[in-house]
Amino acid sequence: MSMEQDTRALLPTQGTAWATASAPVARLQGPQGDSHQACSQEPHSPSSAEAPYCDLPRCPPALQNPLRTTTCVGQSVHSLGLGLGQEPQRVWSPTTALPAEGPAAAPKNRHQDSEGIPYLEGLARSSCTDDNDNKDEDEDPNSNTSSSQDSNTPHDTSNSSSVDWDTTERPGVVPSRNRLTEMIPRRPQEGLRADSARKATRSPARGDTAGQRKENSGSGGQSAGQHWAKLRSESGYFSLERQRSGQTQASSGTPPSGPRGTTQASSAQRDVFQAAPAQEAPQTSSLPRNTQRDTQRSTPRTSSPSRVSQRDTPRVMSTQRKNTPLSSPLRATPETLKISAPEDGTHVTPSPCVQDSSLNRTSQRDSSRTPCIQWDNPRASSPNRTTQRDNPRTPCTQRDNPRASSPNRTTQRDNPRTPCTQRDNPRASSPNRTTQRDNPRTPCAQRDNPRAASPNRSTQRDSPRTPCAQRDNPRASSPNRTAQRDNPRTPCAQRDNPRTSCTSQNTPRTPSTQADKTTASCSKWEHLRSACTQRDNPRTFSQGCTQKDNPGPPSPRRATQGSNSRNPSPHRTNKDIPWASFPLRPTQSDSPRTSSPSRTKQNQVPWASISLRPTQGDKPQTSAPTRLAHNDPPQQYSPSLATTSSSSHNPGHSSASRTSSPLHAAPRGAPQTSLESSQPPCTVCIGHRDAPRASSPPRYFQYDPFPFFPDPRSSESESPHHEPPYMPPAVCIGHRDAPRATSPPRHTQFDPFPFLPDTSDADNESPQHDPPQFPPPVCIGYRDAPRASSPPRQFPEPSFFQDLPRASTESLVPSTDSMHEPPHIPTPVCIGHRDAPSFSSPPRQAPEPSLFFQDPPGTSMESLAPSIDSLHGCPLLPPQVCIGHRDAPRASSPPRHPPSDIGLLAPSPPPGSSGSRGSAPPGETRHNLEREEYTMLADLPPPRRLAQRGPEPQAQGSNEGRTRSPGRAEVERLFGQERRKSEAPGAFQTRDEGRSQRPSQAQSQLRRQSSPAPSRQVTKPSAKQAEPTRQSRTGPPHPKSPDKRPEGDRQLQRTSPPARTPARPPERKAQIERHLESGHTGPRQSLGGWQSQERLSGPQSPNRHPEKSWGSQKEGPSLGGWPELEGPSLEGIWRGPPQEHREQWGHSEAWEEPPSNGIQGAPPRGQGRLQELSRPHQPTPSSENSWAGPAECSCALQPEASTAVGWRAEGTSPHQRSAERPPDLDWRDLLGLLRAPEDGAWTRLPRLDWEGLLELLQARLPQKDPARHWHDPAKASGPEQGSSGTEDTLKTEPQTQPEGRAKATLANGHRPGQQSESPAQLPSPACTSTQWPTTKVTSGPETSPLAALEQIDHLESHSPPDLEFQPEEPEASEPSRGEDSRAVQKQADSADKRPAEGKAGSPLKGRLVTSWRMPGDRPALFNPYLLSLGVLRWQRPDLLNFKKGWMSILDEPGEWKKHWFVLTDSSLKYYRDSTAEEADELDGEIDLRSCTDVTEYAVQRNYGFQIHTKDAVYTLSAMTSGIRRNWIEALRKTVRPTSAPDVTKLSDCNKENTLHGYGTQKSSLKIGEQRTGSEVIGRGGPRKADGPRPSLDYVELSPLAPSSPQRMRTLSRSTPERPTKQEDLERDLAQRSEERRKWFESTDGRTPETPSGDGSRRGLGAPLTDDQQSRLSEEIEKKWQELEKLPLRENKRVPLTALLNQAHNDRRGPTSDSHEALEKEVQSLRAQLEAWRLRGEAPQNAPRLQEDSHIPPGYISQEACERSLAEMESSHQQVMEQLQRHHERELQRLQQEKEWLLAEETAATASAIEAMKKAYQEELSRELSKTRSLQQGPESLRKQHQLDMEALKQELQVLSERYSQKCLEIGALTRQAEEREHTLRRCQQEGQELLRHNQELHSHLSEEIDRLRSFIASQGTGNSCGRSNERSSCELEVLLRVKENELQYLKKEVQCLRDELQVIQKDKRFTGKYQDVYVELNHIKTRSEREIEQLKEHLRLAMAALQEKEAVRNSLAE
């Protein structure tokens, strides 16, 4: 022992030479027992260190040179002992330290010691395994050699040089070469598995048919050694030995009687020592060799990567075991002992523990299950471990079942390899597990622990054990296998040896193998002994194995033994070797082992299909058969163990091993692989990424002491770890991960025989990739896998989701859940692709239902639950989910999803939306999926064209938006028209006025046409576009059939009235129809949306006609009309939108009820409609919707209704709005805006802040009460009104008007009837509007529907004249609304964008809810209503304001940096590029809220401009002046939002004001325009004077009311644009009046009818007759004439006043918000008063309205004029006063600034003067000092000069010395160069001579060949004969080679037999000694008993004598 220890001590340092030198001695001794002792005892010290490699002793004999068979064995053992002794120490350290020294030293030692030790280890296993194998092979020389070779190979393989060794040594060992070759095949990863298999298969093939039969029968994995073990077990000897072994191992020191018992004891002890080096101390005498062997094995292990892995793993294992021990103190202690005293401490410290462990081992081994249980108990800390451990052998299946029973176990188990993730997780779960797992090499023990720690470990361990169990089962099937099972480790060893056996181990170290041959003999003998011991102690091993697996932790030895036995044992070695083995295997494949090699290939394939390993890991454990397969190829055991051990040993190979074991399982149980692959894949799936992360375990590999080995193994280890993640087919996740998982291929890469591993690698990788297929669920994880954290990601796209999206890499559980749910949700997951990450905004979620219907709406990537909810919530929304693909990421910013997208998406997305947001960054996989989705979306061109409005197909819009930029789509959608406006402000203004409106409508229609469905609508409108639109409004649009007319009308309205709406709604419709076509929510949405819209307009129109129409529509629209639209549509719409909005708004609670219907059913319909109307809006959610939808809808509806349904259009609009819940607020806003004009709310709106808004609402409500139920509620409801209020009002008014009853409508807009009717609809609005004061609006009974209609018309600014005006107002008002709505939409969009960007809880929620903010607030989400009211100051930028493009920005250093700029409502953001924008990777942003001005600025390059903010000035440059101009305009608009006006034309003052007053100004302007329109119409109709005027009175803009609305609009717009330019105003007025004329001409036909209730109804309900139209035209012409007389002057005044007011307000806004607030309060109060006054006058108003109808159509009533003039005057005075005050304040401020600047300048000048003084003084002092120094005289200068001279001289001297040195150096170098030249010449000459010699030889060879040919030719009778002769000669050569191979094989077998004989002899000697000692002890015992009896007799006699004496004394005393 000491000598061997010393030797070993030397080995580490001396390296291979010493190991080799000592190896012969050790080997000679070893086989004899010294080496065995060395192995046994030395492991004591190294044992701890080598505990991990304790298994190595199993293969100890085959140490360095398999060729040195005889010497090798002894030497191997000795070397192992020595090598191990020291190597273990060193190696142990190397294990820890090997990376540094290990690679070099370890490789040597590995080759030598490793060869010996791995060989020993291989022998231990190889002896066991190979002995089994060889016994199967009948002592197949290769078997032993294989063991040795395998052992060596593993080391070599591990070293990768092992391959070389194998290759190099192989030639050396020709006999072993077969095996080596065979082993080479094994050497590949599969070598491990294949080794077992091959050994099983090959053993018989190679060695014996009997062996083969045995292997095939069940000892296939047993090898010859196993066979022997079986035979012994059959003979009972093995069983006895086994028990002895168990005892021996258990008692370490007590060799079981019987040579084999001894051998087994030794082997077992070896293993025990390996497992428990400490034990080996007790065993020292008997186990020294074992210890040494163990140590050597351990050292070889250390030497071999497997061992390194093992060792590392042992360390790690120890560590892990420590970790495991953490689980179980026992384990900890043993492991700690192992670890703590790896070499000395191990055998010293562990010795007691080990002995205890030994005892425990005995118990544990005998109780191996108990140890298992102990392990399990240690594992008990980890139930999986315990269970699996407890189940280890027995519940191989149970373990498998445990795995099955416990998903983790199953997963871990199935995933043990497969779920590296779980493993990783287990590892993660238990660092031990992780570490252990990470130390897969160690993992036999570690893995045992890891398994103990983690089910995987348990699994692996259990797997090994289970393989033991299975092997046991296999063995159970065949006693031999049982023996082997007992030998499972033996089989493990055998398996390991089989691998080792697989000549690959031995062969890889062929030289070693030859040495190992001898050593192999010894080692194999040792191994045989080990095998025998294991075999004999199969239970000991088995138990030991189990204990190793189980006890391993309890007893370090066992753990080490188990782990080492497995891992260190050839198994590990095999794994190590398998790498090396693979090369050998080919030979084996040549040999009978060919079958094994085949398996190897299978293994390789499995290896290739690493995923199989998980399966196999699972299956091996799970299915005994698999294990049998594994067993059969003991490597199965290995596979498990191999996977475990190999994994443990060779992280890489281990991976391979794990993989390999699965692979083996795959090879053997390929089906299992597939099955398990299938199973694990899912599980693993998740882990893939996790697995790779799990790969962290590889880190332990990373720290592998033997990096070179770890490279194969480390890689393998990593691979195993990766592999576990990798192994799982789940690699899917791993696709990315898979490549990582592919790490196992790394081991393959390391594979000495890459060609072999390549197959494995290819297979492995392929399987890995395939496994990824398995974890399709993981697909989620592709990108999501990492992000899997949020299931939503899980489904990037259903299509992408080959894998279940749920298989989130995130977590198995989530993944599992995901997997379970994903099937349904997967589609939804689509949302999550990108959405999942950014899912924050639902809108993206459902860019377009039809597009994404594939995905369940709920499948938000965000979370399954949300997704599910979404799914449940809105099945139709699933498509929305898809939205998330791209949308998800962008979801962060709804803008990307066109607002419509948001709107659409919002409904469904909200639930998942948050989830989406939560789910993950758009990132990774999502992108791809999103892109696909995008492609789908992008395929929808209409959205782009319709993007403006078209976003209705948000999916498309979003797609495009997304594809392009969600923002862009949204902007186009929102601002498409506005952009056109901004681009052509005049045109827009004209359009707003109505002049351009038609074109815009036409454009909208065209756009709509561009969208499929819209085209039909558009076709009508476009066909009729201008006129038909008007007509449709007045006449055709009013066909009484609500459906027909509404449809046509709506189409027209949408097309013409809501240019935007048409544009969008058509698109929406198109998209919706598309959706319908898609069959998603399309039908409902399309039908619901379209019909609902159309019906809304239709019913609205009809409502106008038949009040019942309203009633029906009211209830019908909500229930009936909407049902027509799609019965549920209304409710659906209402609920749906509300739902959507709830989701959007986050008011799902409010929308709770509707959500289910709304979201599920309603959104489809409602969404359809909402999508049509609301979609654009929804995207903006409410804002855009409300504007686009409500504004447009109401505009659209109003235009339709304008004829007869003016109010209805609006009312319907509200319905629609309500229906389009998103628009609810928006609709309310629209209603507010639309109605405001009627109520004057519009007028008021512009300036009203919250108070104004509330007052407005109140005012509206009152007003509504007077004549317009809905109007008031709309106003009262405010936003609510918009949707619910409006709906109520609509419904109420229709009812009230038709029925002439005044119903109280709640501010919610829910009237009792309506609420019941559209409770869902209204509730949504109500919910939404609940934020607004819910004021009951009791609509005063409108006696006549006409009056009501008229009033409503007034309210809607569509009075009967409104019909006229409506055409105008719908166009004008609509344009204004359009602008408003657009502005609002923009705001909404911006808000949407913001919310999306801000990822407000719910984009819609944020949008809608956030919309309601205090005036100062800049809502992240814009509420168009608030914006219109002026509550929200910030309005959406025009299209120009929404801008993207490349520009350069001047950074601080003064460098130009090019960025992708994106202009949003509140900031200018810049990104690296558009992709970064998609990913939301912001480089910076410029806050435009503090922007004061945007000016051109000359820069050196391109065209520059500056953005001035309060904080800084930003300089940017555009490529062209046009781009710069566009940017400046957009920025100015953003800074000073104006509806249509070109901001660039605004005066600075206006610009400043614009920002402030934009919302109010724009709103007021629009309101004014609408109101003006209504008044203008009102002039024609009775309500114009009364209805509109009061409204006008309310509004500051009221002055505008007197002037023609269009002109006023023009003026107001012009004013904002260029309020100071009278000429422009006049020009605009002229244009607008002209346009109005056109409008009126088109609507003239309606005007005549409007005056009378009938007429208005008729206009609303039915198309006008030609006569009527002509009359209307005439009247309108007259009105225009009068209008142009009156209004122009008034307009001039009004606009100025209004402009001044607004400008003033704007100015005041910035300068004095308080004044503005006060003024707004006053106005609101005035509005209230006016409202009450109107109510009071309501009864009179009706008649008056009729009377007013008599007023010439072109004229404005005197009252209205006077009122407007008075208002104008008062407002003008106020404005002038304000201007004066402002001027004074400015003067004061300027004066203060002047003074401050002067003071500052003075201070600066003073400080500068002081600084100059100081500088002058300093300079003066310097000069003075110089002068003084000069005055001192030349003396100082001389001194200084001398000093300088001296310094220079010194320096010169130093330089001269250096020069001399350099000269000498140069001379020396010159001489050297000459010498080299001479040498070179000489070498050249020699080369030439050699070349000549070579040529001569070549010529001789040619002559010989010629002679041979002639000889052959002469022998051949003919060509054919010659050919046959040639063939025969070739055949003879082949036969010769075959015979040589057979000879080598036989030599190997002989060597193995010699080794076995030596082992047996040693066992015999030990047995004899043991018997002698036993007899002696018996004699002593008998003698002692006799003496005791005698002493007792003496004592009894003495006591009797004393008693007698006492009695006598007493008697005497008496």
UniProtKB/Swiss-Prot annotation:
Disulfide bonds: none annotated. One of its GO terms (molecular function) is actin filament binding. Residues 32-48, 155-165, 245-269, 281-290, 316-327, 348-362, 394-410, 418-434, 499-522, 531-549, 558-571, 601-625, 671-681, 808-817, 1018-1034, 1088-1103, 1280-1298, 1313-1342, 1601-1614 have a biased composition (Polar residues). Residues 1711-2010 form a coiled coil. Residues 184-198, 713-724, 924-934, 961-983, 1040-1052, 1065-1078, 1138-1150, 1263-1274, 1374-1397, 1615-1647 have a biased composition (Basic and acidic residues). Residues 142-154, 297-308, 585-600, 638-657, 697-706, 890-906, 913-923, 997-1017 have a biased composition (Low complexity). The keyword Cytoplasm applies. Residues 1440-1536 form the PH domain. Keywords: Actin-binding, Cell cycle, Cell division, Cell projection, Coiled coil, Cytoplasm, Cytoskeleton, Methylation, Mitosis, Nucleus, Phosphoprotein, Ubl conjugation. GO terms for biological process: actin filament bundle assembly; auditory receptor cell stereocilium organization; cell division; positive regulation of substrate adhesion-dependent cell spreading; sensory perception of sound. Residues 1-67, 84-1225, 1263-1343, 1357-1404, 1539-1671 are annotated as: Disordered. The modification Omega-N-methylarginine is found at residue 1579. The modification Phosphothreonine is found at residue 1879. Residues 130-141 have a biased composition (Acidic residues). Pfam families: PH. One of its GO terms (cellular component) is midbody. Gene3D superfamilies: Pleckstrin-homology domain (PH domain)/Phosphotyrosine-binding domain (PTB) (2.30.29.30). It comes from the Eukaryota. Contains at least 2 actin-binding sites per coiled-coil dimer. May regulate actin cytoskeletal organization, cell spreading and cell contraction by directly binding and stabilizing filamentous F-actin. The localized formation of TRIOBP and TRIO complexes coordinates the amount of F-actin present in stress fibers. May also serve as a linker protein to recruit proteins required for F-actin formation and turnover. Binds to TRIO and F-actin. May also interact with myosin II. Interacts with HECTD3. Interacts with PJVK. Isoform 4 forms homodimers. Isoform 4 interacts with ANKRD24; recruiting TRIOBP isoform 4 to stereocilia rootlets. This is TRIO and F-actin-binding protein. The lineage of its organism: Eukaryota, Metazoa, Chordata, Craniata, Vertebrata.
